[in-house]
Regions:
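Bacterial N-terminal signal peptides that target proteins for export
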Residues: 1-9
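Aromatic (phenylalanine/tyrosine) cluster motif
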Residues: 4, 18-21, 44
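Bacterial N-terminal signal peptides
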Residues: 9-19
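Extracellular parallel beta-helix/beta-solenoid repeat domains
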Residues: 23-324
């Protein structure tokens, strides 16, 4: 047992040392997500806005730091009440800096949360998730410095979020932006993505009718924007497919794109995950078909430099791809 403890401690020390050295040497972007997730997770303080009592709240940081620059998770969440979900809306956070992450959620923090999974086993899940989740949130003119966690996570059912003129830096063990199942109608505009990510920059996972326009993807070694449906993970049935999204006038730096990665990939998974059958037994959604159905999306005016045959991969159907 003593030897095990010593060995475990040594591993943690090595990983911690590797983290700081890798950041200094700009190695993290070349490190895949599964390795980055082994690194020690830093401790975050929480700043929480919960329920309708926060409706219309404006947090103007006036160019300064949220929480004095301490590593912080800003949480905007609904409150589970006896009579239903008490939902916050029309919150604005703007004009400042955040060291950490922002997560917005209702039914659950991610697609595998217990209440999300329970709801997904019945028809009408998308509507329930959206009714329960925060809506009409504005994040504007923010500088978000990531540290290990995904810096912006819109959880199942979140709708009507606008992310405008924000800059994302730092590093993430996963993606930079995650649009989770059953979310939709969100807008990401005029943002700059320079996070050293262990995966694609932006995951559109069963999220629909979003607009992603006029953004700059400067760190896209493992891909830029991927549309898919994360079939079966955690036993949750995914109902909505990543359809009706508009991806327009974005710039992608393709210089360091890794083999097998793409600037934009419509249908990046298609059931190629070991857990895809974990939601079996229900007559709808990903339970009956593990494919992504990344269909009916519009891509236009996007710029990929240098030019590459890995700019766009279309594994969906009826997508309109109009490039400059």
């Amino acid at each position: 047992m003593g030897r095990f403890i010593v060995n475990s401690t040594l591993v943690l020390v090595v990983l911690t040392t590797f983290t700081f050295f890798a950041m200094g040497q700009d190695w993290l972007p070349q490190t895949p997500s599964f390795l980055l997730k082994l690194l020690p997770k830093p401790k975050f303080e929480k700043h929480t806005l919960e329920g309708s009592e926060e409706n219309g709240r404006v947090i103007d940081l006036q160019g300064g730091w949220l929480n004095e620059g301490k590593l912080t998770e800003m949480v905007i969440r609904s409150k589970d009440m006896e009579k239903g979900w008490d939902v916050p809306e029309r919150i604005k956070i703007r004009n400042g800096r955040i060291r950490g992450s922002i997560r917005i959620y209702g039914l659950g923090v991610n697609g595998e949360a217990a209440k999300v999974r329970e709801s997904s086993h019945r028809e009408g899940h998308t509507a329930r998730a959206q009714v329960a989740a925060p809506r009409a949130i504005l994040l504007e003119d923010l500088q978000i410095e990531a540290n290990h966690r995904i810096p912006l996570y819109l959880s199942p059912g979140v709708t009507g979020v606008t992310v405008k003129n924000c800059t994302f830096t730092g590093w993430s063990a996963s993606t930079t932006v995650y649009l989770d199942a059953e979310s939709g109608g969100n807008r990401i505009e005029g943002c700059t993505f320079e996070v050293r990510s262990g995966r694609e920059v932006m995951a559109v996972d069963g999220s629909a009718t979003n607009t992603i326009i006029g953004n700059r993807f400067f760190q896209a070694r493992y891909g830029g924007i991927y549309l898919y449906r994360n079939c079966g993970e955690g036993g949750t049935v995914r109902h909505q497919a990543p359809q009706g999204n508009v991806i327009e006038n974005n710039f992608f730096n393709m210089k360091d794109l890794r083999s097998g990665s793409y600037g934009i990939w419509l249908g990046s998974r298609q059931g190629r995950r070991s857990y895809c059958e974990d939601d079996a037994g229900y007559p709808f959604g990903s339970s009956i078909d593990n494919r992504d159905f990344a269909d009916h999306n519009i891509l236009r005016g996007n710029i990929f430099q240098p030019a590459s045959d890995h700019a766009v991969r279309d594994d969906g159907s009826d997508n309109r791809i109009l490039q400059k």
